UniProtKB/Swiss-Prot annotation:
Superkingdom per UniProt: Viruses
Comp. bias intervals (Basic and acidic residues): 17-32
Polar residues biased stretches: 88-106, 148-160, 194-203
EC number: 2.7.1.21
Protein family membership: Belongs to the herpesviridae thymidine kinase family.
Highest classification ranks of the organism: Viruses, Duplodnaviria, Heunggongvirae, Peploviricota, Herviviricetes
Quaternary assembly: Homodimer.
Disulphide bonds in the chain: none
Record's subcellular location: Virion tegument; Host nucleus
Principal EC category: transferase
Region of interest called Disordered, as start-end residue ranges on this chain: 1-160, 180-215
Protein name: Thymidine kinase
Gene Ontology molecular function, alphabetical: ATP binding; thymidine kinase activity
Length: 607
Protein backbone atom coordinates (compact mmCIF):
# COMPACT_ATOMS: atom_id res chain seq x y z
CA UNK A 1 0.00 0.00 0.00
CA UNK A 2 1.26 3.46 -0.81
CA UNK A 3 3.05 5.05 2.11
CA UNK A 4 3.87 1.70 3.73
CA UNK A 5 7.55 0.67 3.73
CA UNK A 6 8.35 -2.24 1.48
CA UNK A 7 4.84 -2.47 -0.01
CA UNK A 8 3.75 -1.86 -3.56
CA UNK A 9 0.78 0.33 -4.35
CA UNK A 10 -2.22 -1.31 -5.91
CA UNK A 11 -5.28 -3.33 -4.99
CA UNK A 12 -5.00 -6.56 -2.96
CA UNK A 13 -4.30 -9.93 -4.56
CA UNK A 14 -7.99 -10.67 -4.94
CA UNK A 15 -8.27 -7.79 -7.41
CA UNK A 16 -5.06 -8.19 -9.37
CA UNK A 17 -7.00 -9.62 -12.29
CA UNK A 18 -9.00 -6.44 -12.61
CA UNK A 19 -5.80 -4.44 -12.54
CA UNK A 20 -4.38 -6.29 -15.51
CA UNK A 21 -7.29 -5.22 -17.67
CA UNK A 22 -6.36 -1.99 -19.47
CA UNK A 23 -9.92 -0.87 -20.22
CA UNK A 24 -10.75 2.75 -19.34
CA UNK A 25 -13.21 1.63 -16.72
CA UNK A 26 -10.72 -0.60 -14.93
CA UNK A 27 -8.10 2.15 -15.21
CA UNK A 28 -10.41 4.41 -13.28
CA UNK A 29 -10.84 1.64 -10.68
CA UNK A 30 -7.05 1.32 -10.42
CA UNK A 31 -6.66 5.04 -9.81
CA UNK A 32 -9.41 4.88 -7.22
CA UNK A 33 -7.68 2.03 -5.38
CA UNK A 34 -4.42 3.98 -5.42
CA UNK A 35 -6.17 6.98 -3.92
CA UNK A 36 -7.61 4.77 -1.18
CA UNK A 37 -4.18 3.31 -0.45
CA UNK A 38 -2.64 6.78 -0.22
CA UNK A 39 -5.36 7.87 2.11
CA UNK A 40 -5.16 4.89 4.46
CA UNK A 41 -1.98 5.64 6.47
CA UNK A 42 -3.14 9.10 7.41
CA UNK A 43 -6.43 7.86 8.85
CA UNK A 44 -5.34 5.13 11.23
CA UNK A 45 -1.93 3.96 12.42
CA UNK A 46 -1.23 0.49 11.05
CA UNK A 47 -0.77 -2.35 13.49
CA UNK A 48 0.99 -5.69 13.34
CA UNK A 49 4.12 -6.17 11.34
CA UNK A 50 3.64 -2.94 9.45
CA UNK A 51 3.73 -0.85 12.62
CA UNK A 52 6.78 -2.58 13.97
CA UNK A 53 5.20 -3.10 17.39
CA UNK A 54 4.03 -6.67 16.77
CA UNK A 55 0.86 -6.23 18.78
CA UNK A 56 -2.37 -8.11 18.00
CA UNK A 57 -5.45 -6.54 16.52
CA UNK A 58 -7.67 -7.29 19.53
CA UNK A 59 -10.45 -4.98 18.46
CA UNK A 60 -10.63 -6.46 15.01
CA UNK A 61 -11.01 -3.04 13.46
CA UNK A 62 -8.63 -3.49 10.56
CA UNK A 63 -10.12 -6.00 8.16
CA UNK A 64 -10.02 -6.65 4.46
CA UNK A 65 -12.92 -4.89 2.70
CA UNK A 66 -15.34 -7.15 0.83
CA UNK A 67 -15.91 -4.74 -2.04
CA UNK A 68 -14.85 -1.33 -3.28
CA UNK A 69 -15.58 1.33 -2.24
CA UNK A 70 -15.17 -0.14 1.26
CA UNK A 71 -17.69 0.52 4.00
CA UNK A 72 -16.93 2.07 7.34
CA UNK A 73 -17.36 -0.06 10.41
CA UNK A 74 -20.77 0.11 12.05
CA UNK A 75 -21.12 1.83 15.36
CA UNK A 76 -23.15 0.79 18.37
CA UNK A 77 -25.79 2.66 20.29
CA UNK A 78 -23.16 4.32 22.45
CA UNK A 79 -21.27 5.68 19.43
CA UNK A 80 -18.35 3.23 19.86
CA UNK A 81 -17.04 1.22 16.95
CA UNK A 82 -18.42 -2.34 17.16
CA UNK A 83 -15.76 -5.07 16.73
CA UNK A 84 -16.54 -7.35 13.84
CA UNK A 85 -14.00 -10.16 13.64
CA UNK A 86 -10.59 -11.01 15.04
CA UNK A 87 -7.36 -11.03 13.14
CA UNK A 88 -7.26 -14.79 13.37
CA UNK A 89 -10.62 -15.08 11.67
CA UNK A 90 -9.47 -12.84 8.84
CA UNK A 91 -6.30 -14.85 8.46
CA UNK A 92 -8.16 -18.17 8.33
CA UNK A 93 -10.71 -16.96 5.80
CA UNK A 94 -8.46 -15.00 3.48
CA UNK A 95 -5.33 -17.09 3.68
CA UNK A 96 -3.24 -14.05 4.66
CA UNK A 97 -0.70 -13.96 7.46
CA UNK A 98 -1.22 -11.69 10.47
CA UNK A 99 1.59 -9.51 9.28
CA UNK A 100 0.32 -9.07 5.77
CA UNK A 101 -0.76 -5.72 4.43
CA UNK A 102 -4.44 -6.72 4.45
CA UNK A 103 -4.68 -6.46 8.22
CA UNK A 104 -3.63 -2.81 7.98
CA UNK A 105 -6.68 -1.78 5.98
CA UNK A 106 -8.45 1.04 7.86
CA UNK A 107 -11.88 -0.31 6.90
CA UNK A 108 -13.92 -2.98 8.61
CA UNK A 109 -15.61 -6.07 7.27
CA UNK A 110 -19.34 -6.31 8.04
CA UNK A 111 -20.25 -9.17 10.30
CA UNK A 112 -20.85 -12.40 8.41
CA UNK A 113 -19.32 -11.07 5.16
CA UNK A 114 -16.36 -12.62 3.35
CA UNK A 115 -13.83 -11.03 0.97
CA UNK A 116 -14.05 -12.25 -2.62
CA UNK A 117 -12.16 -15.47 -3.28
CA UNK A 118 -9.49 -15.70 -5.97
CA UNK A 119 -10.51 -16.77 -9.43
CA UNK A 120 -9.30 -20.38 -8.97
CA UNK A 121 -11.27 -20.91 -5.73
CA UNK A 122 -14.97 -21.34 -5.17
CA UNK A 123 -16.61 -18.97 -2.71
CA UNK A 124 -17.25 -20.60 0.64
CA UNK A 125 -19.53 -19.67 3.49
CA UNK A 126 -17.85 -17.67 6.25
CA UNK A 127 -16.77 -19.63 9.31
CA UNK A 128 -17.71 -17.79 12.52
CA UNK A 129 -14.93 -17.30 15.02
CA UNK A 130 -15.10 -16.16 18.64
CA UNK A 131 -14.63 -12.48 19.25
CA UNK A 132 -12.38 -10.99 21.92
CA UNK A 133 -13.63 -8.30 24.25
CA UNK A 134 -11.84 -5.14 25.23
CA UNK A 135 -11.33 -6.50 28.71
CA UNK A 136 -9.28 -9.46 27.46
CA UNK A 137 -9.37 -12.39 25.06
CA UNK A 138 -9.96 -14.99 27.77
CA UNK A 139 -13.38 -13.70 28.85
CA UNK A 140 -16.70 -14.58 27.27
CA UNK A 141 -18.26 -11.80 25.16
CA UNK A 142 -21.18 -10.12 26.83
CA UNK A 143 -23.92 -9.30 24.28
CA UNK A 144 -25.80 -7.19 26.84
CA UNK A 145 -22.94 -4.76 27.42
CA UNK A 146 -24.50 -2.24 25.08
CA UNK A 147 -27.78 -2.58 26.93
CA UNK A 148 -26.23 -1.91 30.33
CA UNK A 149 -24.41 1.18 28.99
CA UNK A 150 -27.57 2.88 27.77
CA UNK A 151 -29.19 5.63 29.77
CA UNK A 152 -32.42 3.66 30.27
CA UNK A 153 -30.65 0.95 32.34
CA UNK A 154 -28.15 2.91 34.41
CA UNK A 155 -28.56 3.11 38.14
CA UNK A 156 -30.61 1.26 40.71
CA UNK A 157 -32.03 -2.20 41.16
CA UNK A 158 -34.75 -1.58 38.56
CA UNK A 159 -32.21 -1.21 35.79
CA UNK A 160 -30.54 -4.47 36.84
CA UNK A 161 -33.89 -6.26 36.91
CA UNK A 162 -34.85 -4.95 33.47
CA UNK A 163 -31.56 -6.12 32.01
CA UNK A 164 -32.04 -9.49 33.67
CA UNK A 165 -35.58 -9.79 32.34
CA UNK A 166 -34.40 -9.20 28.76
CA UNK A 167 -31.58 -11.69 29.21
CA UNK A 168 -33.78 -14.28 30.92
CA UNK A 169 -36.50 -13.89 28.30
CA UNK A 170 -34.03 -14.52 25.49
CA UNK A 171 -32.66 -17.66 27.15
CA UNK A 172 -36.08 -19.10 27.92
CA UNK A 173 -37.31 -18.21 24.42
CA UNK A 174 -34.42 -20.21 22.92
CA UNK A 175 -35.22 -23.09 25.23
CA UNK A 176 -38.88 -23.01 24.17
CA UNK A 177 -37.86 -23.18 20.50
CA UNK A 178 -35.65 -26.18 21.18
CA UNK A 179 -32.34 -24.36 20.51
CA UNK A 180 -29.96 -25.91 23.07
CA UNK A 181 -26.29 -25.20 23.55
CA UNK A 182 -25.44 -27.54 20.68
CA UNK A 183 -28.29 -26.70 18.32
CA UNK A 184 -28.37 -28.06 14.79
CA UNK A 185 -28.54 -24.56 13.36
CA UNK A 186 -25.25 -23.47 15.00
CA UNK A 187 -21.70 -24.71 14.87
CA UNK A 188 -19.58 -25.53 17.86
CA UNK A 189 -17.61 -22.34 17.43
CA UNK A 190 -20.79 -20.32 17.72
CA UNK A 191 -21.46 -21.76 21.16
CA UNK A 192 -18.99 -19.22 22.52
CA UNK A 193 -21.42 -16.49 21.58
CA UNK A 194 -23.92 -17.81 24.16
CA UNK A 195 -25.29 -15.24 26.54
CA UNK A 196 -24.04 -15.68 30.10
CA UNK A 197 -26.33 -17.44 32.48
CA UNK A 198 -28.51 -15.51 34.86
CA UNK A 199 -26.28 -16.53 37.75
CA UNK A 200 -23.15 -15.13 36.10
CA UNK A 201 -24.98 -11.95 35.16
CA UNK A 202 -26.12 -11.49 38.75
CA UNK A 203 -22.68 -12.29 39.98
CA UNK A 204 -21.19 -9.46 37.92
CA UNK A 205 -23.88 -7.02 38.96
CA UNK A 206 -23.94 -7.84 42.67
CA UNK A 207 -20.20 -7.60 43.18
CA UNK A 208 -19.42 -11.31 42.91
CA UNK A 209 -22.35 -12.51 45.03
CA UNK A 210 -24.33 -15.32 43.46
CA UNK A 211 -27.52 -14.82 45.45
CA UNK A 212 -30.04 -12.71 43.51
CA UNK A 213 -32.24 -9.99 44.91
CA UNK A 214 -35.96 -10.39 45.71
CA UNK A 215 -37.10 -9.57 42.19
CA UNK A 216 -34.56 -12.04 40.78
CA UNK A 217 -35.84 -14.76 43.11
CA UNK A 218 -39.38 -14.08 41.88
CA UNK A 219 -38.33 -14.30 38.24
CA UNK A 220 -36.26 -17.42 38.82
CA UNK A 221 -39.22 -19.09 40.57
CA UNK A 222 -41.42 -18.43 37.57
CA UNK A 223 -38.79 -19.39 35.00
CA UNK A 224 -40.50 -22.72 34.35
CA UNK A 225 -43.81 -21.04 33.50
CA UNK A 226 -41.98 -18.55 31.27
CA UNK A 227 -40.27 -21.40 29.43
CA UNK A 228 -43.57 -23.28 28.99
CA UNK A 229 -45.25 -20.17 27.57
CA UNK A 230 -42.41 -19.62 25.09
CA UNK A 231 -42.54 -23.25 24.03
CA UNK A 232 -46.29 -23.11 23.44
CA UNK A 233 -45.90 -19.92 21.39
CA UNK A 234 -43.22 -21.53 19.24
CA UNK A 235 -45.36 -24.64 18.69
CA UNK A 236 -48.35 -22.50 17.72
CA UNK A 237 -46.20 -20.55 15.24
CA UNK A 238 -44.93 -23.75 13.62
CA UNK A 239 -48.45 -25.18 13.49
CA UNK A 240 -49.89 -22.06 11.85
CA UNK A 241 -47.10 -22.11 9.29
CA UNK A 242 -47.84 -25.75 8.48
CA UNK A 243 -51.54 -25.04 8.05
CA UNK A 244 -50.83 -22.08 5.77
CA UNK A 245 -48.49 -24.23 3.67
CA UNK A 246 -51.24 -26.82 3.25
CA UNK A 247 -53.85 -24.25 2.30
CA UNK A 248 -51.53 -22.34 -0.06
CA UNK A 249 -49.81 -24.97 -2.15
CA UNK A 250 -48.79 -22.46 -4.80
CA UNK A 251 -47.99 -19.40 -2.72
CA UNK A 252 -45.87 -17.75 -5.41
CA UNK A 253 -48.63 -18.09 -7.97
CA UNK A 254 -51.20 -16.64 -5.57
CA UNK A 255 -48.91 -13.68 -4.93
CA UNK A 256 -48.49 -13.03 -8.64
CA UNK A 257 -52.24 -13.24 -9.18
CA UNK A 258 -52.91 -10.81 -6.31
CA UNK A 259 -50.39 -8.32 -7.71
CA UNK A 260 -51.93 -8.65 -11.16
CA UNK A 261 -55.41 -8.05 -9.75
CA UNK A 262 -54.25 -4.96 -7.86
CA UNK A 263 -52.56 -3.65 -10.98
CA UNK A 264 -55.69 -4.37 -13.02
CA UNK A 265 -57.97 -2.67 -10.48
CA UNK A 266 -55.76 0.45 -10.43
CA UNK A 267 -56.07 0.94 -14.18
CA UNK A 268 -58.02 4.06 -15.11
CA UNK A 269 -61.08 3.06 -17.19
CA UNK A 270 -60.99 6.22 -19.34
CA UNK A 271 -57.74 4.94 -20.86
CA UNK A 272 -59.60 1.88 -22.09
CA UNK A 273 -62.47 3.99 -23.38
CA UNK A 274 -60.27 6.19 -25.51
CA UNK A 275 -57.87 3.58 -26.85
CA UNK A 276 -58.11 2.70 -30.51
CA UNK A 277 -59.62 -0.65 -31.42
CA UNK A 278 -60.85 -2.42 -34.52
CA UNK A 279 -64.63 -1.92 -34.73
CA UNK A 280 -66.68 -5.11 -34.87
CA UNK A 281 -70.23 -4.31 -35.96
CA UNK A 282 -72.94 -6.68 -34.75
CA UNK A 283 -76.75 -6.48 -34.54
CA UNK A 284 -78.02 -6.61 -30.96
CA UNK A 285 -81.31 -6.21 -29.13
CA UNK A 286 -81.28 -4.25 -25.85
CA UNK A 287 -83.35 -5.66 -22.98
CA UNK A 288 -83.71 -3.99 -19.58
CA UNK A 289 -84.88 -6.27 -16.76
CA UNK A 290 -87.14 -4.46 -14.30
CA UNK A 291 -89.12 -5.43 -11.24
CA UNK A 292 -89.32 -5.16 -7.47
CA UNK A 293 -86.25 -5.97 -5.38
CA UNK A 294 -85.67 -9.70 -5.05
CA UNK A 295 -87.71 -10.97 -8.02
CA UNK A 296 -84.67 -12.64 -9.64
CA UNK A 297 -83.24 -10.16 -12.15
CA UNK A 298 -79.60 -10.80 -11.27
CA UNK A 299 -80.13 -14.56 -11.24
CA UNK A 300 -81.60 -14.44 -14.73
CA UNK A 301 -78.73 -12.29 -16.03
CA UNK A 302 -76.09 -14.64 -14.63
CA UNK A 303 -77.86 -17.60 -16.22
CA UNK A 304 -78.03 -15.96 -19.64
CA UNK A 305 -74.40 -14.88 -19.48
CA UNK A 306 -73.32 -18.44 -18.75
CA UNK A 307 -75.47 -19.85 -21.58
CA UNK A 308 -74.76 -17.38 -24.40
CA UNK A 309 -71.20 -16.36 -23.53
CA UNK A 310 -69.73 -13.88 -26.03
CA UNK A 311 -73.08 -13.41 -27.76
CA UNK A 312 -74.34 -11.50 -24.72
CA UNK A 313 -73.19 -8.36 -22.92
CA UNK A 314 -74.54 -8.13 -19.38
CA UNK A 315 -74.64 -4.73 -17.69
CA UNK A 316 -74.87 -5.22 -13.90
CA UNK A 317 -76.54 -2.92 -11.45
CA UNK A 318 -74.10 -0.14 -10.42
CA UNK A 319 -74.23 -1.12 -6.77
CA UNK A 320 -70.66 -0.06 -5.97
CA UNK A 321 -71.23 3.48 -7.18
CA UNK A 322 -74.36 3.73 -5.08
CA UNK A 323 -72.77 2.36 -1.92
CA UNK A 324 -69.01 3.14 -2.01
CA UNK A 325 -68.59 6.36 -4.00
CA UNK A 326 -69.02 9.20 -1.52
CA UNK A 327 -72.00 8.36 0.72
CA UNK A 328 -74.01 5.12 0.77
CA UNK A 329 -77.19 6.13 -1.05
CA UNK A 330 -78.84 2.71 -0.62
CA UNK A 331 -78.44 2.83 3.15
CA UNK A 332 -79.62 6.43 3.35
CA UNK A 333 -82.69 5.71 1.21
CA UNK A 334 -83.80 2.67 3.23
CA UNK A 335 -83.21 4.64 6.41
CA UNK A 336 -85.65 7.30 5.26
CA UNK A 337 -88.17 4.71 4.09
CA UNK A 338 -88.14 2.75 7.36
CA UNK A 339 -88.29 5.85 9.59
CA UNK A 340 -91.43 6.95 7.71
CA UNK A 341 -91.00 10.68 8.36
CA UNK A 342 -93.69 11.71 5.90
CA UNK A 343 -94.38 15.22 4.66
CA UNK A 344 -91.10 16.80 5.82
CA UNK A 345 -88.93 18.98 3.62
CA UNK A 346 -85.64 17.64 5.01
CA UNK A 347 -86.72 14.08 4.29
CA UNK A 348 -87.70 15.04 0.75
CA UNK A 349 -84.32 16.70 0.22
CA UNK A 350 -82.44 13.59 1.39
CA UNK A 351 -84.58 11.34 -0.81
CA UNK A 352 -84.02 13.64 -3.79
CA UNK A 353 -80.25 13.49 -3.32
CA UNK A 354 -80.35 9.70 -3.22
CA UNK A 355 -82.54 9.44 -6.31
CA UNK A 356 -80.34 11.79 -8.29
CA UNK A 357 -77.36 9.60 -7.43
CA UNK A 358 -79.31 6.53 -8.58
CA UNK A 359 -79.91 8.11 -11.98
CA UNK A 360 -76.30 9.11 -12.68
CA UNK A 361 -74.86 5.70 -13.76
CA UNK A 362 -77.80 5.00 -16.07
CA UNK A 363 -77.54 8.36 -17.81
CA UNK A 364 -73.77 8.08 -18.22
CA UNK A 365 -73.92 4.56 -19.62
CA UNK A 366 -76.79 5.42 -21.96
CA UNK A 367 -74.80 8.33 -23.38
CA UNK A 368 -71.73 6.14 -23.89
CA UNK A 369 -73.79 3.40 -25.49
CA UNK A 370 -75.43 5.91 -27.82
CA UNK A 371 -71.99 6.95 -29.09
CA UNK A 372 -71.25 3.35 -30.12
CA UNK A 373 -74.46 2.97 -32.10
CA UNK A 374 -74.01 2.66 -35.87
CA UNK A 375 -76.87 4.83 -37.09
CA UNK A 376 -76.06 4.34 -40.78
CA UNK A 377 -77.10 0.70 -40.62
CA UNK A 378 -80.50 1.51 -39.15
CA UNK A 379 -82.61 -1.01 -37.23
CA UNK A 380 -84.25 -4.29 -38.19
CA UNK A 381 -86.45 -6.95 -36.67
CA UNK A 382 -84.98 -9.32 -34.13
CA UNK A 383 -83.39 -12.38 -35.73
CA UNK A 384 -82.53 -15.68 -34.03
CA UNK A 385 -78.78 -15.14 -34.42
CA UNK A 386 -78.71 -11.58 -33.07
CA UNK A 387 -76.69 -10.67 -30.00
CA UNK A 388 -78.24 -9.45 -26.77
CA UNK A 389 -77.42 -6.50 -24.52
CA UNK A 390 -78.97 -7.29 -21.14
CA UNK A 391 -79.22 -4.56 -18.50
CA UNK A 392 -80.04 -4.81 -14.83
CA UNK A 393 -82.60 -1.98 -14.65
CA UNK A 394 -83.26 1.03 -16.85
CA UNK A 395 -83.22 4.72 -16.03
CA UNK A 396 -87.01 4.36 -15.89
CA UNK A 397 -86.84 2.82 -12.42
CA UNK A 398 -84.56 5.48 -10.91
CA UNK A 399 -86.25 8.56 -12.40
CA UNK A 400 -89.90 7.51 -12.72
CA UNK A 401 -90.99 4.32 -10.91
CA UNK A 402 -89.39 4.73 -7.49
CA UNK A 403 -89.90 8.52 -7.36
CA UNK A 404 -93.60 7.88 -8.02
CA UNK A 405 -93.70 5.38 -5.16
CA UNK A 406 -91.95 7.86 -2.85
CA UNK A 407 -94.32 10.64 -3.92
CA UNK A 408 -97.35 8.52 -3.04
CA UNK A 409 -95.71 7.70 0.31
CA UNK A 410 -95.27 11.45 1.00
CA UNK A 411 -91.50 11.05 1.21
CA UNK A 412 -90.95 13.22 -1.88
CA UNK A 413 -92.45 16.64 -2.51
CA UNK A 414 -94.06 17.76 -5.77
CA UNK A 415 -91.14 20.03 -6.60
CA UNK A 416 -88.53 17.32 -5.99
CA UNK A 417 -90.58 14.82 -7.98
CA UNK A 418 -90.51 17.13 -11.02
CA UNK A 419 -86.72 17.50 -10.63
CA UNK A 420 -86.22 13.75 -10.84
CA UNK A 421 -88.79 13.25 -13.59
CA UNK A 422 -86.97 15.77 -15.80
CA UNK A 423 -83.88 13.51 -15.87
CA UNK A 424 -85.72 10.66 -17.61
CA UNK A 425 -84.36 9.74 -21.03
CA UNK A 426 -84.73 6.73 -23.31
CA UNK A 427 -83.65 5.68 -26.78
CA UNK A 428 -85.67 4.03 -29.53
CA UNK A 429 -85.09 0.29 -29.26
CA UNK A 430 -85.02 0.11 -25.44
CA UNK A 431 -87.22 -2.78 -24.33
CA UNK A 432 -88.39 -3.06 -20.73
CA UNK A 433 -88.89 -6.62 -19.42
CA UNK A 434 -91.21 -6.25 -16.44
CA UNK A 435 -90.75 -9.32 -14.25
CA UNK A 436 -93.87 -9.63 -12.11
CA UNK A 437 -94.10 -11.75 -8.98
CA UNK A 438 -96.66 -12.08 -6.21
CA UNK A 439 -95.83 -10.30 -2.98
CA UNK A 440 -95.60 -13.45 -0.83
CA UNK A 441 -93.04 -15.17 -3.04
CA UNK A 442 -91.19 -11.91 -3.52
CA UNK A 443 -90.94 -11.44 0.24
CA UNK A 444 -89.63 -14.98 0.67
CA UNK A 445 -86.88 -14.41 -1.89
CA UNK A 446 -86.01 -11.07 -0.34
CA UNK A 447 -85.49 -12.67 3.07
CA UNK A 448 -83.50 -15.51 1.52
CA UNK A 449 -81.13 -13.01 -0.08
CA UNK A 450 -80.46 -11.56 3.38
CA UNK A 451 -79.12 -8.11 2.54
CA UNK A 452 -78.70 -6.03 5.68
CA UNK A 453 -80.13 -2.79 4.27
CA UNK A 454 -83.25 -4.66 3.06
CA UNK A 455 -84.16 -6.06 6.48
CA UNK A 456 -86.64 -3.24 7.15
CA UNK A 457 -88.64 -3.75 3.93
CA UNK A 458 -92.07 -5.31 4.30
CA UNK A 459 -94.85 -6.56 2.05
CA UNK A 460 -96.41 -3.09 1.91
CA UNK A 461 -93.25 -1.67 0.38
CA UNK A 462 -93.17 -4.35 -2.31
CA UNK A 463 -96.85 -3.76 -3.11
CA UNK A 464 -96.27 -0.03 -3.52
CA UNK A 465 -93.35 -0.72 -5.89
CA UNK A 466 -95.52 -3.04 -8.00
CA UNK A 467 -98.27 -0.41 -8.11
CA UNK A 468 -95.76 2.16 -9.37
CA UNK A 469 -94.65 -0.17 -12.15
CA UNK A 470 -98.29 -0.77 -13.06
CA UNK A 471 -98.92 3.00 -13.24
CA UNK A 472 -95.99 3.49 -15.60
CA UNK A 473 -97.11 0.57 -17.74
CA UNK A 474 -100.62 2.00 -18.06
CA UNK A 475 -99.14 5.37 -19.04
CA UNK A 476 -97.05 3.65 -21.70
CA UNK A 477 -100.18 1.99 -23.12
CA UNK A 478 -101.83 5.41 -23.46
CA UNK A 479 -98.82 6.71 -25.40
CA UNK A 480 -99.34 3.89 -27.90
CA UNK A 481 -102.92 5.05 -28.65
CA UNK A 482 -102.83 8.83 -28.21
CA UNK A 483 -100.54 11.65 -29.26
CA UNK A 484 -98.29 13.12 -26.55
CA UNK A 485 -99.82 16.59 -27.03
CA UNK A 486 -103.33 15.24 -26.32
CA UNK A 487 -102.16 13.52 -23.16
CA UNK A 488 -100.52 16.74 -21.90
CA UNK A 489 -103.76 18.62 -22.54
CA UNK A 490 -105.55 16.10 -20.36
CA UNK A 491 -102.91 16.54 -17.63
CA UNK A 492 -103.30 20.33 -17.81
CA UNK A 493 -107.09 20.03 -17.46
CA UNK A 494 -107.85 21.44 -20.90
CA UNK A 495 -109.77 18.31 -21.93
CA UNK A 496 -110.61 14.76 -20.80
CA UNK A 497 -109.48 11.41 -22.03
CA UNK A 498 -113.03 10.52 -23.05
CA UNK A 499 -113.26 13.62 -25.23
CA UNK A 500 -109.97 12.73 -26.87
CA UNK A 501 -111.33 9.25 -27.69
CA UNK A 502 -114.51 10.66 -29.24
CA UNK A 503 -112.63 13.23 -31.33
CA UNK A 504 -110.36 10.59 -32.83
CA UNK A 505 -111.23 9.82 -36.47
CA UNK A 506 -110.19 6.19 -36.15
CA UNK A 507 -110.70 5.20 -32.53
CA UNK A 508 -108.72 2.06 -31.71
CA UNK A 509 -109.62 1.92 -28.03
CA UNK A 510 -112.89 2.35 -26.26
CA UNK A 511 -113.39 5.35 -24.04
CA UNK A 512 -114.12 3.19 -20.99
CA UNK A 513 -110.83 1.36 -21.32
CA UNK A 514 -108.97 4.63 -21.94
CA UNK A 515 -110.55 6.19 -18.84
CA UNK A 516 -109.53 3.21 -16.71
CA UNK A 517 -105.99 3.31 -18.02
CA UNK A 518 -105.73 7.02 -17.33
CA UNK A 519 -106.90 6.68 -13.71
CA UNK A 520 -104.35 3.95 -13.01
CA UNK A 521 -101.51 5.69 -14.84
CA UNK A 522 -98.88 8.17 -13.73
CA UNK A 523 -100.65 10.86 -15.79
CA UNK A 524 -103.37 11.18 -13.18
CA UNK A 525 -100.65 11.92 -10.60
CA UNK A 526 -99.01 14.42 -12.94
CA UNK A 527 -102.33 16.26 -13.29
CA UNK A 528 -102.45 16.68 -9.52
CA UNK A 529 -98.79 17.78 -9.36
CA UNK A 530 -98.98 20.52 -12.01
CA UNK A 531 -102.53 21.67 -11.23
CA UNK A 532 -101.46 24.68 -9.06
CA UNK A 533 -99.06 25.84 -11.81
CA UNK A 534 -100.61 24.34 -14.93
CA UNK A 535 -99.99 27.58 -16.90
CA UNK A 536 -96.23 27.37 -16.32
CA UNK A 537 -94.43 26.55 -19.54
CA UNK A 538 -91.57 24.68 -17.83
CA UNK A 539 -93.90 22.21 -16.13
CA UNK A 540 -95.78 21.61 -19.36
CA UNK A 541 -92.53 21.01 -21.24
CA UNK A 542 -91.41 18.52 -18.60
CA UNK A 543 -94.66 16.61 -19.00
CA UNK A 544 -94.46 16.71 -22.78
CA UNK A 545 -90.83 15.51 -22.86
CA UNK A 546 -91.65 12.69 -20.47
CA UNK A 547 -94.61 11.56 -22.57
CA UNK A 548 -92.62 11.57 -25.80
CA UNK A 549 -89.71 9.73 -24.27
CA UNK A 550 -91.97 7.12 -22.69
CA UNK A 551 -93.39 6.34 -26.13
CA UNK A 552 -89.93 5.25 -27.32
CA UNK A 553 -89.99 2.22 -25.04
CA UNK A 554 -91.38 -1.25 -25.62
CA UNK A 555 -92.64 -3.52 -22.85
CA UNK A 556 -92.48 -7.28 -22.34
CA UNK A 557 -94.45 -8.70 -19.41
CA UNK A 558 -93.42 -11.95 -17.71
CA UNK A 559 -95.24 -13.51 -14.77
CA UNK A 560 -92.57 -15.33 -12.80
CA UNK A 561 -95.16 -17.28 -10.81
CA UNK A 562 -95.57 -19.52 -13.88
CA UNK A 563 -91.83 -20.27 -14.00
CA UNK A 564 -90.92 -21.34 -10.49
CA UNK A 565 -87.17 -22.11 -10.59
CA UNK A 566 -87.36 -22.43 -14.37
CA UNK A 567 -84.92 -19.95 -15.83
CA UNK A 568 -84.81 -21.51 -19.34
CA UNK A 569 -88.60 -21.41 -19.52
CA UNK A 570 -88.68 -17.78 -18.41
CA UNK A 571 -86.12 -16.80 -21.04
CA UNK A 572 -88.07 -18.66 -23.72
CA UNK A 573 -91.13 -16.56 -22.91
CA UNK A 574 -89.10 -13.33 -23.15
CA UNK A 575 -87.43 -14.44 -26.37
CA UNK A 576 -90.68 -15.40 -28.11
CA UNK A 577 -92.35 -12.08 -27.22
CA UNK A 578 -89.34 -10.21 -28.61
CA UNK A 579 -89.52 -12.16 -31.88
CA UNK A 580 -93.28 -11.71 -32.30
CA UNK A 581 -93.40 -7.98 -31.55
CA UNK A 582 -92.40 -6.06 -34.72
CA UNK A 583 -91.81 -2.90 -32.67
CA UNK A 584 -88.93 -4.58 -30.82
CA UNK A 585 -85.97 -4.18 -33.14
CA UNK A 586 -82.26 -4.87 -33.19
CA UNK A 587 -79.69 -2.15 -33.79
CA UNK A 588 -76.09 -2.28 -34.97
CA UNK A 589 -73.41 -1.51 -32.38
CA UNK A 590 -69.64 -1.42 -32.26
CA UNK A 591 -69.49 -4.66 -30.31
CA UNK A 592 -65.78 -4.46 -29.49
CA UNK A 593 -66.02 -0.91 -28.14
CA UNK A 594 -69.17 -1.67 -26.17
CA UNK A 595 -67.57 -4.76 -24.65
CA UNK A 596 -64.63 -2.67 -23.41
CA UNK A 597 -66.91 -0.07 -21.87
CA UNK A 598 -69.05 -2.64 -20.08
CA UNK A 599 -65.98 -4.53 -18.84
CA UNK A 600 -64.74 -1.33 -17.19
CA UNK A 601 -68.12 -0.83 -15.53
CA UNK A 602 -68.08 -4.43 -14.32
CA UNK A 603 -64.53 -4.06 -12.96
CA UNK A 604 -65.50 -0.95 -11.04
CA UNK A 605 -68.54 -2.74 -9.68
CA UNK A 606 -66.42 -5.67 -8.44
CA UNK A 607 -63.69 -3.47 -6.85
Amino acid sequence: MAGFPGKEAGPPGGWRKCQEDESPENERHENFYAEIDDFAPSVLTPTGSDSGAGEEDDDGLYQVPTHWPPLMAPTGLSGERVPCRTQAAVTSNTGNSPGSRHTSCPFTLPRGAQPPAPAHQKPTAPTPKPRSRECGPSKTPDPFSWFRKTSCTEGGADSTSRSFMYQKGFEEGLAGLGLDDKSDCESEDESNFRRPSSHSALKQKNGGKGKPSGLFEHLAAHGREFSKLSKHAAQLKRLSGSVMNVLNLDDAQDTRQAKAQRKESMRVPIVTHLTNHVPVIKPACSLFLEGAPGVGKTTMLNHLKAVFGDLTIVVPEPMRYWTHVYENAIKAMHKNVTRARHGREDTSAEVLACQMKFTTPFRVLASRKRSLLVTESGARSVAPLDCWILHDRHLLSASVVFPLMLLRSQLLSYSDFIQVLATFTADPGDTIVWMKLNVEENMRRLKKRGRKHESGLDAGYLKSVNDAYHAVYCAWLLTQYFAPEDIVKVCAGLTTITTVCHQSHTPIIRSGVAEKLYKNSIFSVLKEVIQPFRADAVLLEVCLAFTRTLAYLQFVLVDLSEFQDDLPGCWTEIYMQALKNPAIRSQFFDWAGLSKVISDFERGNRD
